[in-house]
Each structure stands twice: as structure tokens, then as C-alpha cells.
């Protein structure tokens, strides 16, 4: 009898492994099989009976994981908080580690394999997977920072019910790089600008100076060439779905002007949230205090943010 009870309990544990539930909100592993491996994600489902609207959340640039955390910038849990708040309001969500990042690290054997379109094509496959899941009635995209451009591009390739842009850059990446590097000494910009313009034209650059290897090493050039092809304003203008553009006025990385540029492309007025920074939190206006929020995983989202997102999804 004791053995039978043990086996039943063990079976239940195996079934529940990878699933968690908090306050009626359930999280489970939700993965996408692609050529060469698996992209690992998390599905957060509200309490109650579906089908539910579902939002696919795409993280920002670099080593940012599904929760919005990065070994470079720190842990802020911003994207995880969005998922939880959506579920609390009856909306499911999918968030995932991009190929080459965190649990999905194994999909990239070499940095030179990765191009910007990989992220776009992966997201299209996620949209198709969610669209074929009977638990979901409609699919929305939430893209943060670089993830906003990736989500926008994916929305031009397949049908979605809406797109939420969070802290999306308004200019092509090559313009951003040139602008950021313009603060460097002239001898640096004299070297970097010609390299950027060559990459913009789709040509690789040999013999990059040692001091610029971190930016323009051979293995990253294919990604830069592919990324430079995309003009966010043009891409946003090609989306055939409802769009909302949300930007904080306390963002150290992306400006209100970026949001206005994107708004012109999409033919709408952006939503500007006073006091919100790049990681979607309410932050001090000084740079030091602002950056400290990047490493506070318990600091809540800006109080106005989720109302904007939830109202948009519910009304579209």
C-alpha cells in the first residue's frame, strides 16, 4: 500500500515538474523546436477557462533573457512582471530566451552564424505555434528595445491582432552607432564611420583596428550587416495590425523623439509615460539613481504601464 501511494505521488510530481502556480496563475515550460535545436520559453496562463488572448514578449538586445535580465545590466525582472500582470488580468503570455541566450544558448555554435533575421524568423514561428494552440483566441506581440523592431518586422510577415512597442529605437542601427560614437575623439570617429558605412552597404571589413575589435570583430559583422538593413520607421509603417507605441521620458537609452519617429511611421501618436525609464520602472531623474533600478528585481513596473498594455489588448 505504501509503495502504491509513493508511486502515485511520484507520478504527480513528474506531471507537475516544470509547472508552477501562484494565486491561480500557472506557469509552464513552453518550447519551440527549430532547425538545430530548441528555443526555451515560459507560458503564463491566467486562472479560469480559455481560450485566452496571448501576448508573445520579445526581450531587448544582447544577453537579455526571457525575464528581462542580463549579466551585463543586471536583474530587473521587468518582462516577468509584465507576464504576471497580464495573467492577473486574464491574458496569457509567452516569453522566451532568444537563440544563443540563457537556456537557448546551444542554438548558436559560433557568433558568426547569427543574423538579425534569425530572431525575426524565430518569432514568426512562435506566432504560428501560439496561433495553432487551441488555448489561445488571438496573438499579440510585445517587443522591448531591440525586441520592438524584431516584433515589428515579424508583424509584417504574419498576421497578429496587435503590437505593443516598448522603448523601441526610431532610427536605423547604423545611425544610432554613428551618433553614439560621435562623442568620441575625432581619431576614433575617423576610423569607425567608414567601417559602419561599409557594413551598411553589405560589405564586410577586413583589418579592423585592435581598439575597435569589440565593436566590429569579424564574427559580429554578419549580424551588423543584417541589422543595418532595417529602418524602424519604415517597418512600423508596413504593419497591418493595431499598434501602440509606449515610451518613458526618463529613458537613458531611447528618447521620446525615437517614439515620435516611430509614431510618424505608424501614423499614430505615441504614449509617453512620465518618469518611466528603459527597463519600464519609475526611476530617479539622475543617471546614477536611474541605473540602480536595473539591478533591483523587486522594484515594480511603472504604475501606468500595464493599464496601457491591458487596455490596448482588451480593445483590439
Predicted regions: what they are:
Residues 22-50:
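N-terminal cap/lid segment of alpha/beta-hydrolase-fold proteins
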Residues 49-51, 55-85:
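Short, surface-exposed "cap/lid" segments of acyl-processing enzymes
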Residues 77-105:
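Conserved alpha/beta-hydrolase
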Residues 111-133:
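Alpha/beta-hydrolase active-site loop
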Residues 129-182:
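Primarily recognizes the serine-hydrolase "nucleophile elbow" in alpha/beta-hydrolase
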Residues 164-234:
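Accessory cap/linker subdomain of secreted extracellular hydrolases
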Residues 239, 245-247:
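Short beta-strand/loop motif that positions the catalytic acidic residue
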Residues 252-258:
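Conserved alpha/beta-hydrolase "acid-adjacent" motif
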Amino acid at each position: 500500500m505504501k509503495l502504491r501511494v509513493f508511486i502515485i505521488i511520484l507520478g504527480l510530481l513528474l506531471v507537475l515538474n516544470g509547472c508552477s502556480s501562484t494565486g491561480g496563475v500557472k506557469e509552464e515550460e513552453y518550447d519551440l523546436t527549430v532547425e538545430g535545436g530548441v528555443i526555451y520559453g515560459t507560458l503564463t496562463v491566467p486562472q479560469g477557462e480559455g481560450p485566452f488572448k496571448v501576448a508573445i514578449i520579445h526581450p531587448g538586445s544582447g544577453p537579455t533573457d526571457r525575464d528581462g535580465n542580463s549579466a551585463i545590466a543586471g536583474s530587473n525582472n521587468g518582462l516577468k512582471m509584465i507576464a504576471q500582470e497580464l495573467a492577473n488580468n486574464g491574458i496569457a503570455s509567452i516569453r522566451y530566451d532568444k537563440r544563443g541566450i540563457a537556456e537557448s544558448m546551444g542554438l548558436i555554435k559560433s557568433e558568426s552564424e547569427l543574423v538579425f533575421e534569425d530572431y525575426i524568423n524565430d518569432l514568426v514561428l512562435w506566432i504560428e505555434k501560439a496561433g495553432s494552440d487551441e488555448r489561445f483566441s488571438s496573438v499579440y506581440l510585445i517587443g522591448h528595445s531591440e525586441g520592438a523592431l524584431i516584433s515589428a518586422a515579424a508583424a509584417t510577415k504574419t498576421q497578429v491582432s496587435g503590437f505593443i512597442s516598448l522603448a523601441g529605437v526610431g532610427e536605423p542601427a547604423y545611425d544610432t552607432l554613428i551618433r553614439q560614437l560621435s562623442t568620441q575623439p575625432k581619431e576614433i570617429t575617423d576610423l569607425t564611420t567608414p567601417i559602419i558605412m561599409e557594413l551598411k552597404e553589405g560589405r564586410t571589413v577586413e583589418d579592423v583596428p585592435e581598439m575597435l575589435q569589440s565593436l566590429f570583430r569579424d564574427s559580429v559583422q554578419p549580424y551588423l550587416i543584417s541589422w543595418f538593413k532595417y529602418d524602424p520607421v519604415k517597418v512600423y509603417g508596413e504593419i497591418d495590425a493595431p499598434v501602440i507605441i509606449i515610451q518613458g521620458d526618463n529613458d537613458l537609452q531611447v528618447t521620446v523623439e525615437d517614439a515620435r519617429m516611430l509614431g510618424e511611421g505608424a501614423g499614430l501618436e505615441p504614449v509617453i509615460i512620465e518618469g518611466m525609464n528603459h527597463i519600464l520602472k519609475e526611476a530617479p531623474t539622475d543617471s546614477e539613481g536611474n541605473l540602480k533600478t536595473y539591478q533591483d528585481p523587486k522594484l515594480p513596473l511603472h504604475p501606468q504601464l500595464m493599464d496601457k498594455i491591458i487596455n490596448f489588448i482588451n480593445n483590439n
